[in-house]
């Protein structure tokens, strides 16, 4: 086994973080004129993404990123908190909402957007629907 250098830069970095902690960036509030709010509501999690018209991601959040773990990530309350965290960081003058998935968080996220008085141009459900494509997985037997 190779002996490790005590004065290596890697060791210094870890010692510095141990002593002084991580430096946290302050959250920036971003202003955009037109934007698209993508809501991906699966049964296990809800992911909210704000993009500009070209599709470049400006900010995103999810129920897991807001501190929820396990089955609580799929709840409507977790989706509400994730949407609030996005809306407080991004100021949008006009928005279109694209909803994907059929989880519990889709209605809760849309309700938060409407409650914060963001002018919504369109609400579109873009959940993929197979025209008899792949065979679905077998049903669970408990």
Curated annotation (Swiss-Prot):
Entries under Pfam families matching the protein: Ribosomal_S11
Subcellular location, record wording: Plastid, Chloroplast
GO CC terms: chloroplast; ribonucleoprotein complex; ribosome
InterPro entries: Ribosomal_uS11, Ribosomal_uS11_sf
Keywords per UniProt: Chloroplast, Plastid, Ribonucleoprotein, Ribosomal protein, RNA-binding, rRNA-binding
SUPFAM superfamilies the record matches: Translational machinery components
Predominant place of localization: plastid
One GO MF term: rRNA binding
Example of a GO biological process term: translation
Quaternary context: Part of the 30S ribosomal subunit.
Family according to the record: Belongs to the universal ribosomal protein uS11 family.
Entries under NCBIfam families matching the protein: PRK05309.1
UniProt name for this protein: Small ribosomal subunit protein uS11c
Annotated organism of origin: Welwitschia mirabilis
Gene that encodes it: rps11
């Amino acid at each position: 086994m190779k002996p490790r250098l005590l004065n290596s830069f890697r060791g210094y970095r870890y010692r510095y973080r141990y002593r002084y902690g991580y430096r946290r960036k302050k959250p920036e509030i971003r202003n955009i004129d037109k934007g698209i709010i993508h809501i991906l509501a699966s049964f296990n999690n809800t992911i909210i993404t704000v993009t500009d018209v070209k599709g470049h991601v400006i900010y995103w959040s999810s129920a897991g990123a807001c501190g929820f773990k396990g089955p609580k990530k799929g709840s409507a309350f977790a989706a509400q908190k994730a949407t609030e965290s996005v809306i407080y960081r991004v100021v949008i003058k006009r928005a279109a909402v694209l909803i994907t998935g059929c989880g519990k968080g889709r209605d809760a996220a849309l309700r938060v957007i409407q409650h914060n008085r963001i002018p919504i141009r369109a609400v579109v459900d873009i959940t993929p629907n197979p025209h008899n494509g792949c065979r679905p997985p077998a049903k669970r037997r408990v």
